[in-house]
Amino acid sequence: MTKTRIRIVVCGDSGVGKTSLIACLVKDQFISWLQDVLPPITIPKDFSSSRYSPENTVVVDTGNSDLATLHKELKNADVIWLVYSDHDSYERIALYWMMMFRSLGVNLPVVLCRNKCDDEVEFLSSANIMDSDDDQLDNKIEDEEFIPILREFKEVETCIKASAKFKFNVNQAFYLCQRTITNPVAPLFDARIGELKPLGVLALKRVFVLSDMDQDGFLNDDEITKLQKKCFSKAVDVNELQFLKDTLTSISSPNQEYEDYILNVPGKGITKDGFLVLNKIYAEKGRHETTWGILRAFHYTDTLTINEKILRPKIDIPQSSSVELSPLGYRFFVDTFLKYDKDNDGGLNNDELHLLFKTTPGLPHLWIETNFPFLTVVNNSACITLQGWLALWSMTTFIDYSVTTEYLIYLGFDKDAKNALQITKPRRKRRRNGVYYRAPVFDRKVLNCYMLGKGNSGKSSLLESFLGRSFSEAYSPTIRPKISVNSLELKGGKQYYLILQELGEQETPILENKGKLDECDVLCLCYDSSDPESFSYIVSLIDKFDYLKELPIVFVALKADLDKQQQRCHIQPDDFADQLFIDHPLHISSTWPSSLNELFIKLTEVALEPITSTAGLGPAVLTNDIDYRQTIVAISSVVGFASLFTFTALKIYSSFKNT
């Protein structure tokens, strides 16, 4: 329920006991003399034991002498508590009151209450058969006088007998009014055909799949117990559980209503059909708050959609910070992978992926747009591996963390989705000799690299090689952006995830977008060392977008296994690198595995320590850094020596003076 405050308007003919019901509700006693109309009364949440009750409930008494005020209150109501007490006031329910609501355009749930059932209450009390438990709702009735109204007016959700004089069902009537808002039956159950509605069925099926931890198609006793604790914060009663299973077995036996269904299998548990039938029975018997208790625990709203605030929580991300998975997030995705890898072959095949994403809208659009699963590591059967699975979620979180939080909830993450994420520190810049450069990075595990270069220079082959795939001679120009993501390990055992992006026809728009460049940790400038026209593209790119020099750069001479050509450019690659004070190009070939590994490690190290490959930071700057540190050390040494000398001199002087 999204409402924190609901408004109950009590109406009905004069003399039916509206004011007495409200007074009895608030004072817990019958008051014989009252004013005609009570002012609005606010009842706090602690009046009810339900954890889904609203923070405040306003009960509004009405009179019939001022129709304008009555109409105004009805239009501002959330639920109508319609009271009658005898045959005449009963007749006016259909002829007057329901017609008034419709003429006003008031399409609200109505709780019909027959007050002044004093004689019946006295009889039940004298016979000792009146249920004294105020929390029981079995006193809700559907005898002959209610059936025509329930059939004719879909707005009437439930009916109840009450007596303000004997404090009978007053609290229950109030609770029923609250429940029409907190736990509405209309979204769940179609009373005309006696079936759960399609959206309700979908939601309950998802709950079943998420609760079926061993994925055997049954909810066993342990799984039901865990579901009960999650939804209602209490353990299930063993006898009650057995009664539910016996009921399902009974109604699915031959010649019974569900004889064509398997609802419960002894020794295994309740089936998905059994779970749906159970919740249908709850709705039929007016116990749909139980179903809502289950759905609320899985973050469903009144429209049977998952709460957007839960799916996409608002997170304040400082400028130049990035979002990564936390250890808790990685643990969840590891567990999810292992749970659905039924054949334990280390990969998720199509059937396993179908089961895994059954509780979601399907594969994330981001994955589909980036050629899933071939943007990351797959096995020989083209099934995504655990390594690729984690790399993919690392990339997804980096590019759009809201997709990750959304799927965390869809897949059954039972904590705040923000707990599965962590935000890196804002990237800092330093300045030396008038040149800005990025400070070293210590807390990032996911790094982003843009690969730039002339067409047919070998960038796509490099992406494939990054994922351990063999070289292909076939050439296909890159139109749409391509992306690859994989993990790699540096010296010391630290693991990182590197995202390589080939921009295709989006290259110019992305390079013109400073925000997109802020997301880039390192530029990989590629040229074909066997094509004399290739390097000039890199030079013109840097001339056009001069601010690219602010990013760490790695030059790469691809196709190094072919004959090296002199570049037809006013400056050669090594000279250009010297001019920018960065390393000479790495000579790489997709057929030389060792050179590839060297490149990917180099890209990662440069992203972590940008000063080593930022244009314009020449040896003088680095020397100044060293000289500066040496100066600090020298000054510290002098100060330390002077302090020691002074201390020693004072000790000698003090000793001499005492002598």
From Swiss-Prot:
InterPro entries with a match to the protein in the record: EF-hand-dom_pair (IPR011992), EF_Hand_1_Ca_BS (IPR018247), EF_hand_assoc_1 (IPR013566), EF_hand_assoc_2 (IPR013567), EF_hand_dom (IPR002048), Miro (IPR021181), MIRO_dom (IPR020860), P-loop_NTPase (IPR027417)
The keyword Transcription appears for this protein: no
Stretches assigned to the Miro domain: 3-183, 444-609
Enzyme class: hydrolase
Pfam families per UniProt: EF_assoc_1 (PF08355), EF_assoc_2 (PF08356), Ras (PF00071)
Cytoplasmic side: 1-631
Record: residues binding GTP 2: 453-460, 489-493, 558-561
GO biological process: mitochondrion organization; small GTPase-mediated signal transduction
Binding site for Ca(2+) 2: D341, D343, D345, E352
GO molecular function, one term: calcium ion binding
Membrane-spanning residues: 632-652
Residue positions binding GTP 1: 12-19, 61-63, 115-118
Cross-referenced PROSITE patterns: EF_HAND_1 (PS00018), EF_HAND_2 (PS50222), MIRO (PS51423)
Residue stretches making up the EF-hand domain: 199-234, 328-363
Entry-linked SMART domains: RAB, RAS, RHO
Membrane-topology annotation of the record: Single-pass type IV membrane protein
Name of the protein: Mitochondrial Rho GTPase 1
Organism ancestry: Eukaryota, Fungi, Dikarya, Ascomycota, Saccharomycotina
